[in-house]
Amino acid sequence: MNKILTFLSVLLMVFSSQAQVKGDQKKVVEVSSLTEFRTYLNQDNVHVKLKAGNYQVDDAKKIRFFEITGNNSYFDLKGARFMVDSKLFSRPDLIKSTDGNSMYCAIEISGNHVMLEGLYIETYGDTPGLQSKNKIFNIVGEHVTLKDVELRTAGSSPWGYGYLYGLGGGDVRKMNGIRVGYPAKNVKLLGCKVHMRAMGHAIFLQGSENTLIEGCEVDGLLRTTDAMLKETSGYGFDKNFYAAKGNYIEGTNVAEDGKILPGEIISLSEDGIRMYPDYNGHPTTNTTVKNCTVTQMRRGICTGLSTSGDKVIDCVVRDCVATGYNVGNADTLINCSADAKYGEAFCIAYTDAKNAKVEMNILDSRNGIANNLLAKINGTGHHVVIKTEAPEFIPEAMAIKLSVWEGYGNFDENAKMHATDITLNNQTNTEVITFNGTENVDIKSKGKVRKATDSENEVNDSNRTKR
């Protein structure tokens, strides 16, 4: 009898749990138009499947063209393609937001526990926005996941000159990819692709917490200044090929008076994956970037501006102009790779950065232009390992330099340049040069290690004011 009662109790529990699972499952709502799709964006607990196909986005009511404000929802957009007319970003009649941020974007997700999967979205046209803060995605909710989303940006101005005419304001109108910003927490970007065909960042964070960026790919375009100087019309031609400022501009050298020089190279976009320090006083913290690739951007992966200590794991950066990895305070790079064709493979640029850990594999850096700096190390207490699979990948003219103004970073000309308490294991044949301000370093190197000459130190110090 007891066995029968036990069996019946177990059977009842099984049926109850199955009923509970069925009750928790959301009914899939299938829609086939953007009008229908919009009706579910402010609803909670929905599972929406948009029919595969091409969708034209050429009208909107607000500066956030699609606003996903509902919670606990899943949007299945696999096979759907949104073609967004860049003219929408210049519409002054669209309703402004109430969050104090005037930026235009195609899709904003402010709801919590939302997943959006599978969308291809592209901006097209050459109409620049009203302001420089345009972007495709703006994520400000908690526990939001973008999965297998693909973006292609267009519609920035002036196009074809990268950062030579400024980073925002003035004539510059950007079209960024994905922003994750305060009050976003626990956001995941999984398997996303961003094709940058506009000035702007591909993926960037401002005041977010606990962000995971995994399996994502970013690519941009490069252009030589030689090609630019051959123009017979256009924005640069009208400016007589003078940039917005002189000397060093984000990885590209111009003349002291701003004249664009031959033999240089620029990225037509900005950074691949970038952390800003904060958003309105809310710090960007605890970011992990894993198994990502960045190609042909200004900086590849830029954690250096966030001081909380971020993790970059198993990432690959190729053909970036300012630096492959911008490393900062307490950052950890594990099994990462980069080349130094057009800019240093990585830099720990800031004098106030402490205790970074870097494992860097140098990729084929031959056949580049305008760069002989393999890596630069400033700051205090870093542990760095540099290696390569083939010695011939690194040209003999390249060097690893400590305590230098050269290359990206060091914008405070009053800073005391130094590299202190550094542990460097250089497993390449590349020469290591220590400049004035290098103290208490532990260097193991296959390549020659030497102190900079007096003339080299003079040149280094002269770069202090050429940022």
Feature locations, PLM:
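Sec-dependent signal peptide recognition
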Residues: 2-10
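Acidic Gly/Asp/Thr-rich repetitive segments characteristic of extracellular carbohydrate-active
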Residues: 21-49
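Surface-exposed or flexible loop/turn and strand-edge residues in extracellular/cell-surface modules
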Residues: 26, 45, 52, 63, ...
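Extracellular beta-strand-rich solenoid/capping regions of secreted or surface-exposed proteins
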Residues: 38-43, 56-74, 83-117, 123-145, ...
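All-beta strand scaffolds that present successive hydrophobic residues in beta-strands
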Residues: 48-50, 75-77, 111-118, 141-148, ...
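Short glycine/acidic-rich loop motifs that flank beta-strands on beta-rich extracellular proteins
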Residues: 59-64, 84-90, 125-134, 155-163, ...
